[in-house]
Amino acid sequence: MTYDVAVFGGGNAALCAALAAREAGRSVVVVERAPRHMRGGNSRHTRNLRCAHGAPTDVLTGAYEDDEFLTDLHRVNGGESNAALSRMLIERSRECAPWMERYGVRFQAALRGTLHLSRTNAFFLGGGKALMNAYYAAASRLGIDVLYDAEAVSFDLDGGSFRAATVETGGERRVIHARAAVVATGGFESNLDWLREAWGDAASNFIVRGTPYNTGGPLRLLLDAGASPVGDARACHAIAVDARAPRFDGGIVTRLDCLPLGIVVNQHGERFADEGQDLWPKRYASWGVLVAAQPGQQAYCLVDAKAIGRFMPSVFPPFVAPSIRELALALALPPDRVGATVDAFNAAVRDAPFDLETLDGCRTEGLTPPKSHWARRLDTRPFWGYPLRPGITFTYLGVTVDEASRVVMNGVPSENLFAAGEVMAGNVLRHGYLAGIGMTIGTVFGRLAGAGAADAAR
């Protein structure tokens, strides 16, 4: 099998690359490890895209300029990302939504609500599944070949340049030759053995929010072949999910957004982090690592009646009780310790106008750890509780790329091997996360990689 461009992966970044290469008139094959009904990688579960814009649009409110976007990114990652790639990502994010719409992707009208995202993020109508269906429909119309249940088991590289790949599909092995290739196969979060190398036994208690097919095979092939690594094996997008979620592929409905509205305690009934440190889209992805550091990698969110209706609930019902003590017992927590924690928290709360849309003045004083915003006493029945575990979305260890999205092999950018999406996200994300930026990385670098591969295949 011979093509101009081979794209490995089947999510947003991969399809953006495939469509961009096809736009340039190249023959393209997409090698998707998942079966057809599971196609799309983690993009199946996405909801929105973060993008800079200078004025309100049909799908975004207000303005979100490049400098503010960059400031937000630096705030969550400590300014450790590749500065040139970060700036380019933000500048090119302006083009993403119109380009997606050309391929049948539809967006919701601008939304307002508790997620603080109406100004910064455009939401997909129908979510990630509709997004990926639109892309695959466009790929079919344009004559892009797609191999499902197909895993790249080896790459034939010559001095850092791509020549061919051996792909296992349907119990057979095929060799795909291509003049250029794009690797967009995600991270290794579904590979529990690899996670244990970084996290130890704690990884056994992680829940994988997305696809079970991101086991890092192509990433390992590239690193073993001399690709320059970027990022840390422990760095990842990880949030707090309902502990009752399935081990794989639970998606957005297992996420818990109630943490800023209450308190979070560990198995000993003790608080361990500031639940109100920052607005939720800039803070939610820190909670997975925080919970992972607790005994048994488990925690519990406690809220009272004042919070009910203010957050998107888990797909699983809350534990409900008429008192804090009874709630602690229902959650198998030490009731005296939980009661003392709640009493200390309530005594430390300083009243102010409550506003979940801003960094309000509702805070604690003299409490460690503090709650910096949205602190209200837990004093109104019924009381709700949710068990939490770390929910990993994707890992940040990946391959280094240049500004053309070429993989840096043995210190030199490859002439025809590109990477996009989570497999190279560590160039931009070293720590933390901004809601929707994963889709931005996939779209911007997917398009860039596809166009670059098309040029290399001339």
Feature names for model-found ranges:
Residues 172, 176-242, 439, 448:
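Glycine-rich loop(s) and the adjacent beta-strand/alpha-helix scaffold that form part
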Residues 39, 89-174, 191-194, 240-243, ...:
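Conserved redox-cofactor binding core of oxidoreductases
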Residues 337, 341-431:
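A glycine-rich dinucleotide-binding beta-alpha-beta segment and adjacent secondary-structure elements
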Residues 1-13, 29:
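Beta1/beta-strand and adjacent pyrophosphate-binding region of the FAD-binding site
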Residues 219-221, 225-339:
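An anion/pyrophosphate-binding glycine-rich loop and adjacent beta-alpha core
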